[in-house]
From Swiss-Prot:
Listed HAMAP family: NDH1_NuoK (MF_01456)
EC number(s) recorded for this UniProt protein: 7.1.1.-
GO molecular function terms listed in the Swiss-Prot or TrEMBL record: NADH:ubiquinone reductase (non-electrogenic) activity; quinone binding
Catalytic activity as recorded in UniProt: a quinone + NADH + 5 H(+)(in) = a quinol + NAD(+) + 4 H(+)(out)
Classification via InterPro entries: NADH_UbQ_OxRdtase_chain4L/K, NUOK/Mnh_C1-like
Keyword Acyltransferase: no
Species of the source: Thermus thermophilus (strain ATCC 27634 / DSM 579 / HB8)
Superkingdom as given in the UniProt entry: Bacteria
Membrane topology of the entry: Multi-pass membrane protein
Underlying gene: nqo11
Any one Gene Ontology BP term: ATP synthesis coupled electron transport
Protein name, entry field: NADH-quinone oxidoreductase subunit 11
Keywords, in A-Z order: Cell inner membrane, Cell membrane, Membrane, NAD, Quinone, Translocase, Transmembrane, Transmembrane helix, Transport
């Protein structure tokens, strides 16, 4: 059960990072931390109950890798356009 406790702690750290950080890259890293906490939870439940949670965790990792590529591409494009990755600057809708 220490897997689930560690997973909950990592998820709480990720939520804290999303709520308190102001740069888009750190918010993005916090979201990735939350996804990894969910993966750890899947594997922890699989180990405790003899299920195949590893397969689901591998699928989540594959989707997260694609998300990282798209997300970092968007952050780089925003930085080139606005010269900043501050989340507060991104809330303004301009043409």
């Amino acid at each position: 059960m220490s897997y689930l406790l560690t997973s909950a702690l990592l998820f709480a750290l990720g939520v804290y990072g999303v709520l308190t950080r102001r740069t888009a890259i750190l918010v993005f890293l916090s979201i990735e931390l939350m996804l990894n906490a969910a993966n750890l939870s899947l594997v922890g439940f699989a180990r405790a109950y003899g299920l195949d949670g590893q397969v689901a965790a591998l699928m989540v990792i594959a989707v997260a890798a694609a998300e990282v590529a798209v997300g970092l591409g968007l952050i780089v494009a925003i930085f080139r356009h606005r010269e900043s990755t501050a989340v507060d600057d991104l809330s303004e809708l301009r043409g």
